[in-house]
C-alpha cells in the first residue's frame, strides 16, 4: 500500500517555481526542489518523471493560476481596467537579478517547443483579456492588446536598467504613457 503524501503535488510545483526563478535554468536541480519542499529527490522522480517533467508541470500549474487571476480581474472596459489587470500580473520584484533570472527562462521558452507552447498559451490568455477590457482605440483591439503587451514587457527591461522606483510603479507609469499616446 502506498504511503500517503505529506506534501501535495500543488505545493511541490509551487516550490519548484520558486526554485526556478531563484536559480535559473542552469542551476535548477531536483535536489534544490527537494530541499525547498522537504521531500527526497527520488520522490520527485517518482511523482513527476524527470527535471523537464517537473518544469512543465510547474509551468502548467502556473498557467492555471494565471488564468484564474485574469478571470477574477474586473472586466470593465477602459484604461483603469487594463492597467489594473497588468498591475495584478506584475510581480513586485526588488532585485534586478531576479528579473535577469526570469529572462534566462524566457530564453528556454524560445528554444523548447513544449515550454514555447505554454508561454504562447499564457500570452494568448493575456491578449484576449486585454482586448476585452480596452477602451475604443483607433486600431483593432487585438493589435492594441499586442502593442500594450509589448509595452508592459518592455517596461520590465527598462526598469532592470534604470531602476526608477518600484517595478510595479514603473510599469504602471509606462502603461499610462502608452494610453496617453494611444488616445491622443
Cite the ranges covered by each PLM segment.
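N-terminal intrinsically disordered/low-complexity leader segments
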Residues: 1-7, 184
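C-terminal peripheral helix-coil segments that are non-catalytic and often amphipathic
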Residues: 128, 132, 147, 158-184
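Hydrophobic alpha-helical connector segments
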Residues: 57, 68-99, 144-148
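Amphipathic alpha-helical packing segments from all-alpha helical-bundle domains
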Residues: 95-103, 111-138, 143-146, 169, ...
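Short, basic, alpha-helical segments at the C-terminal edge of helix-turn-helix-like DNA-binding modules
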Residues: 60-66
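Helix-turn-helix
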Residues: 11, 15-53, 57
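Cytochrome P450 catalytic-core helices
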Residues: 152
